[in-house]
Amino acid sequence: MMDDTFNKWNKWIDVILAEITKLSIDRHIFWEVQDIINNNPKIQKPSSFYDFLRNVYGASAVMGVRKQVKIDKDSISLAKLLQEICDNPKILSRTRYFAHYKGSTVKKIAKLMGSTVEKYRSKEFDQFAGKIGDHVNPELIKLDLEELKSKAKMCEKYADRRIAHFDERAIS
């Protein structure tokens, strides 16, 4: 059961990474175009294309963030992954984490840090385990989940009140 859940989470991470990477690339492209416009006085004039670009990028970014905070039954999102980790913290054990430390790159990093692989990986895992020690601390994950939801709240309001439909209520 634990391996099935772990494998499911790994598949989710691939989906989440692809979605977040897309958001990051879209953001980069949008701001590169803004730099082109800002650095070229000849094209700095009102334009329906610029309005379109802002609207499409804004809607896409807001919906992309919104996707990552949904915890519906069939959703794959960062929030749902964090919630499942909170509910099943023993799946992310120190032993499982250490099993992924292989290869010369880790040895080089540990050596650069003036450490051994064992000490380096233990110190790194301790950030996630806290006082619990043998698996991730669900309270730390819960804090991350709460921060994600808090920061995404304005995007959700905007999406609900301006993108999905136009609401009479202000976004505030």
Language model feature labels by segment:
Residues 145-171:
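Histidine-centered, metal-coordinating catalytic motifs and their short helical/loop contexts
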Residues 40, 171-172:
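General N-terminal targeting signals
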Residues 1-149:
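Amphipathic alpha-helical interface segments
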